[in-house]
A protein has these predicted regions:
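Secondary-structure transition/capping residues
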Residues: 9, 22, 34, 38, ...
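Sequence/structural segment immediately N-terminal to covalent heme-attachment motifs in c-type
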Residues: 1-21, 33-46
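Structured segments of extracytoplasmic/periplasmic soluble domains
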Residues: 5, 14, 30, 43-47, ...
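Electron-transfer interface patches adjacent to heme c in soluble/periplasmic c-type cytochromes
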Residues: 26-42, 50-54, 63-78
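Short acidic (Asp/Glu) and glycine-rich catalytic loops that position anionic groups and cofactors
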Residues: 19-25, 61-62
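Flexible coil segments in periplasmic/lumen-exposed cytochrome c-class electron-transfer proteins
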Residues: 55, 59-125
């Protein structure tokens, strides 16, 4: 899933280091990946748009992160998030399909992208 054309690896790269000069942040060793699993699930399902700071570097967020809500079922979302949370030097707890389903139901009425600021307000860690 990670390496499928147009999915995670396209912007964040095979090595998880992203393309900083093009505005795509890394997934390696960042609290956005290793922090609150609910925050990660939300941004994966609904997408992300707006300025974001990752590992001390500011990214303008002009190109939004694709919302995968209609592209990934609960099992595939959990699988790719667990992969990301345990690759590129990351070592975090897995994400389970029931957790994705729970968050999916909680946010089903939300329309549009999340902003980093919005997610940090509800999930600071």
């Amino acid at each position: 899933i990670y390496e499928k054309e147009g999915y995670c690896g396209t912007c964040h790269q095979e090595n998880g280091l992203g393309l900083p000069d093009s505005g795509f942040p890394p997934l390696a060793d960042t609290n956005w990946v290793n922090g609150d699993h609910k925050r990660l699930i939300k941004l994966t399902l609904k997408g992300l748009m707006g300025p974001i700071e990752v590992k001390g570097r500011n990214y303008p967020g002009l190109v939004p992160m694709t919302p995968f809500e209609s592209l990934l079922d609960d099992y595939d979302a959990a699988a790719v998030l667990t992969f990301i949370r345990n690759s590129f030097g990351n070592k975090s707890e897995p994400v389970f399909p029931w957790q994705v389903n729970q968050v999916r139901n909680e946010i089903k009425e939300k329309s549009g992208f999340y902003s980093p600021a919005e997610l940090l307000t509800t999930h600071p860690n």
